[in-house]
């Protein structure tokens, strides 16, 4: 909580001026996700703020809204790749799937594949050589677009675990 308060102070943000809190639901570290979500829920309840949840798969896909019929948004978990498929309006086409490198290359080599820049250093070289691989910067401003299109969770905010 101290880090959050320090962040507010350093950036001249008054918590009383906030109306919403956005919290990443994952995928990610078990303890980190639970801690982040619990903190966000606590602040939202105590200050009567709207709590909005998002996941990295959807967030990563935002730059490609209405640009591709199919968007595969990936992250890497240990030696496996997890992904979720979205249509051009960022509606889910698939549930989250966990596959290995060979499956990714065999089944999805020609489709648009998106990876967040913060995991690019963990990607296998063979994956980086595939067609239609995009490494993207995650931009917090994209969350406003997702919110305006009603694509974010507003009800049950819960962690997204892989494994």
Predicted regions and their residues:
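Oxyanion-binding and handling regions
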Residues: 56-163
């Amino acid at each position: 909580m101290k880090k959050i308060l320090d962040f507010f102070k350093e950036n001249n943000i008054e918590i009383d001026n906030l109306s919403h809190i956005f919290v990443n639901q994952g995928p990610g570290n078990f303890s980190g996700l639970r801690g982040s979500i619990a903190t966000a829920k606590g602040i939202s309840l105590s200050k009567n703020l709207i709590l909005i949840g998002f996941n990295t798969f959807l967030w990563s896909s935002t730059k490609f809204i209405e640009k591709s019929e199919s968007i595969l948004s990936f992250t890497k978990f240990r030696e496996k790749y997890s992904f979720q498929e979205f249509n051009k309006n960022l509606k889910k086409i698939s549930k989250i799937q966990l596959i290995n490198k060979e499956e990714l290359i065999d089944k999805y080599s020609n489709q648009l594949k998106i990876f967040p820049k913060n995991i690019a250093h963990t990607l296998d070289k063979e994956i980086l050589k595939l067609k239609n691989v995009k490494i993207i910067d995650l931009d917090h401003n994209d969350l406003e677009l997702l919110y305006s299109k009603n694509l974010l969770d507003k009800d049950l905010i819960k962690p997204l675990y892989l494994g």
